Amino acid sequence: MRPELLNALTLAYLGDAIFEVYIREYLVIEKQIVKPNDLQKAAVDYVSAYAQAGFMKAAMENGWLTDEEIAIYKRGRNTKGHGAKNKKTIVHNQSSGFEAIIGHLYLEERHDRIKEIVNFYKKWVDFNKN
């Protein structure tokens, strides 16, 4: 499958699911959180649209992404959904751009790069959540 031919929201849909698995694995295996209520609370720090949007700002400022990934992000971010242009919509669009990157890389079977981005992401969230 050629991910560049897919709608950016489809890439984001897939990327959201893939990213969620990486974060759940991190919380259970690395952080050793095992109580469902604690897992749910911890997951919010990592999978929220606000966290993803904040990470993307940092990633762009620090050069953590390739030119190709930035182009995928912009494509995913700029895909028009329904609704007014308010702060919540803008954050959601930025989050969709991040998820589109993950979905695109997954379809290209670039799992090492996904892990690298997720590792940057986890460190960024852990540093910024307090």
Identify the meaning behind each predicted range.
Residues 1-130:
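Double-stranded RNA-binding/processing signature
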